[in-house]
Amino acid sequence: MTTNLYAIAGPSKPTTPTSTPSPRSEPPSPLKSLTSLPTNPLNPQGTSTSNALTNQSSSTGIGISKPGLSVDENGEVMKVPAFLNKLYTMVSDPEVDDLIYWGENGDSFFVPNAELFGRELLPRWFKHSNFSSFVRQLNMYGFHKVPHLQSGALKNETPIELWEFANPYFKRGQPQLLTKVTRKNNRLSNSGVGSSSSLGGSGAGGGMNTRSASAAAASGSGSGQIQQAISQGHEAGNHSTSGKYLITDGTTPGSAPPSHTSAGPLIAPQTLDLSAINSGIAAIRQTQASIATDLRKLQASNEALWRQAYETQEKQRKHEETIDLIVSFLERLFGTEGEGLKGLKEAMRRGVGVRRDRDGREGRDSRDARFADDDDGGQKKRRRVGLDRMIEGGSGDGTGEHGEIESPSSDDRLVEIGSNSEYSIPSVKRTSSSSHPLSLGQLGSSRFTALPSEDPSPSGSGLGSTPYEGLRTTQASAHGAGADVNVTDPTLGMNHLSPLSDTDPLLPSSSNALAPYTSHPSFPSSNPNPSSAWAFNPSQPLLSPTSAVAAAHAYNLDPSLLQTTIGSLLQSPAVAQMFLKSLSASAQGQALTSHSHPHNPSLLNPNPNGNASTSASASAHDMNTEGLGTGSGTKDLDPTLALFSPLPSHSSLASQSNDLLKSYNDALTVGEGVDNLQESIDSLVRSMGLDLPNGGSSSVGVDVGDGSGVGTGTGEGDGEFNVDEFLQGLAKEGEGEEGEREVGGDGDASSSGAGAENGRKEDVIAQSGLK
């Protein structure tokens, strides 16, 4: 008796392969390409079922298309749960890839938007739209969520989370593995009702309670034939390409009973994974906050460093400007490019950036090094005061503002020039020494260097605009020249003073000058009007920064020549003092003072045969009396008038330019003679076996040009040794023969004889003269 297969597992109602699944009905099998079973029953003439199945399989590629059932590798009929069947269909549908789709490897599937997936896709296949229920069903069938960090995991405002689920038997293109997906259940399995049973034995995943198995048990006579037919059908199916068949049966309720092994808690493993992820995210957020804090601190520190670097650069620039101003001022002050100024530049550059210690140790060291060879304390003080006032005095023209003194120490003060402070620096035009017959190479000593000339004042045609509007005029007669000339009496501009001199202020004025160089004018006969442009102005300082230049323009002289002459004398204060005193005691100076002040016995009748120191001290006393303003107008004569020898008038200056140049040449020759005379005295003293004292004294012989030499001795040395007294003592002894040494008419050679007898020495020195 043949058994019809439809009588065992046939559908309760015919199914159409082209039917569209309703949202709440069981979907068709994923293997839609498999052909259905033949509609005709088996051969009624007694043909075996195995032959029929074999022929059908070999001819048409037989497949079993019952939904919910499948045949495993052993040919056993296995039921696929409806949930897995629906899930496989949803994931494989390309129309809903925006809601659920396979992974790249096909081992898992993704749900990009859980909320949208539960609202739109779940109601089509299930009776609910709760995504949490869907996740619980996946957990029951052994699916697990794949944890991973998304790009926006560190931000709380991310509303969408990408869900990924995987199962080792749920893969793309392999629906036959769905039979190995088992369902977890907390209830103990029952071996009786609902136990697994199969036609040929228990399967790997447990048997299935099917109507075909119960029908086979009821009809025991046909069980062998059914088992043989299914086995043959399985063998025929091995020749097909797929090898697995799903038997669709919409009437099969429920799912297969679970195996004897009980599953653990369903949610616990997933909860542990989520807590680990949350803790990791919290740690990452904390680290991110710490990094952000450190980054803000680093940015603030970077800004502070840049600001400090900018401030340091600005301060360095101001210091450089200050150093340049100081060096340029000192260059104008000293008027030299020698080694002394270079050393001063280097010392200033090294000292600007160094902050002195509070105890002044570094300042003391620098002062000791600077004055190591200086034994005179008063000279130290004068040099220090000169440098301080040189810095405080501002620019060379006396109109600049004073810079700020930053250092609290009075010894080393740094000049800090702010952005608001302005320095009025006079422009300097250096004249070449080769433009005049008197070049620097013709000077007798290396210390006689040219001073820089300042900008010339306005033209001499406008006398009212020159700085000499308030200069006084005086009238004197030069008896040596034998002619009466009108001369002016301005005090020479001595802007370029040495800081080693005794002059206290750098820029003398009526309030701070060593002596107010003022006098009651004696108007010339040609212009007796006191209200003229050359009238006396007591408020006008005679020593101004541009006095030398103004005087040169007033007399149509070369400013470089006048400044060269005066600067050559003022480079060495001792030489300048000796020169002024020599001129004051000269014959022409006596004639000048006797003509201007006939009632002054100290100036009219100096004793040429007596001690020269008495005459010099008397002249100095008159000068001091004039500076203090206690004397009358007859005592206000400036000894520097002797520099203009012969003293020219403003009107006849053009015709007397040759005489003026000759006077300048004589002045330079005097300096050379002083040096030669000093060398002669030194050689004389050494020849006598005496040691030269530190202070040293000099004996100067001056010849004003007419051949009459006047010997003057200045005892300005220390108290231990006086050359004048020594020579007078030698004269009183009267031993030896008198000798006389003639002095050449050019005035460029003067010497003293060093005979065997000491009586000659005094006469040689007294009769030495210069032309």
Swiss-Prot record:
GO terms for biological process: cellular heat acclimation. GO terms for molecular function: DNA-binding transcription factor activity; sequence-specific DNA binding. Induction: Repressed by high temperature (at protein level). Induced by oxidative stress. The keyword Nucleus applies. Its main location: nucleus. Disruption phenotype: Inviable vegetative cell population. Inviable spore. Pfam families: HSF_DNA-bind. Phosphorylated at high temperature. It is found in: Nucleus. Homotrimer. Homotrimerization increases the affinity of HSF1 to DNA. Interacts with transcriptional coregulator SSA1 on chromatin. DNA-binding transcription factor that specifically binds heat shock promoter elements (HSE) and activates transcription. Promotes thermotolerance by transiently regulating a subset of genes. Induces expression of STI, SSA1, SSA2, HSP78 and KAR2 during the heat response. This is Heat shock transcription factor. It comes from Cryptococcus neoformans var. grubii serotype A (strain H99 / ATCC 208821 / CBS 10515 / FGSC 9487). The lineage of its organism: Eukaryota, Fungi, Dikarya, Basidiomycota, Agaricomycotina.
